[in-house]
Amino acid sequence: SAQTYPIGLALCAHCGLAQLSHRVDSSIVFERYFSESFPLTENLVLERKQIPGFERFAQSTIVKTILSVGSGSGRSLQRYKRKGFTVIGIEPSDHQTNVSRNLGIDTLTSYLTETAVEEILSKYGQVDLVLVDNFTKVPHPAHISNVEDLSEYVNNLSRLVKPNGCVYLRVPYIGSILTFGLVDYVYHEHQSYFSYRSIKQLFASVGLHIQSAHLCSN
């Protein structure tokens, strides 16, 4: 029979960050992601919704370089490359990285580690826009909501982005989960579920501030 694990959320009364009260080893919960022998299909509907917002940002600032953390097979970045941006991917899956490189996307096989940050800074310097989103139909092991050390993660993000640059991220919102009883959004891959205050405090700890926040329908 299949192995089962308890699941529950622990909510911080101070900042509103919710995290799993029982964590399962990442090699178990992300086994499917790394065992796929074909490119994981990007969520194209999600991607189309993102593009207009990025274009408005690009028009108001000088955006030349875009870095995607957990870039999957690179198809989402390929659209930005066609628009003239320099695009870079960080992707822990060897298979996904190879697919991405075959599409012409310069992709580093790694999680968002200090070593990966040093390599990117050495090769490209800081970037204008960092994307942290899940472009695949299964939870991504390199997404901010799925990592154990949030402080290290956001510190690495802050090192990658230029002083006048931007970090775009989409995270599970604990407010909607609690208000509407969205228990099917809680599973072992997602270790953290964020409130506005928790994101604000987390990024303020590394000198970043929220420029805008929106509640998405998906």
Residue spans for each PLM region:
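Extended interfacial segments that mediate partner engagement and assembly in macromolecular machines
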Residues: Q3-V99, L108
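Receiver (REC) domain switch-region micro-motif
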Residues: I66, V130, V167
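Conserved SAM-binding strand-loop segment of SAM-dependent methyltransferases
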Residues: G104-E119
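A short acidic, Gly/Pro-enriched loop at the edge of an enzyme's catalytic core
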Residues: E118-V130
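A short SAM/SAH-binding and catalytic strip from SAM-dependent methyltransferases
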Residues: V127-D149
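A short glycine-rich, Lys/Arg-flanked "PGG" loop and its adjoining helix->strand segment in the class I
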Residues: S151-C166
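Short, glycine-/aromatic-enriched active-site segment of Class I SAM-dependent methyltransferases
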Residues: L169-S192, Y196-S198
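Conserved S-adenosyl-L-methionine
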Residues: L208-S217
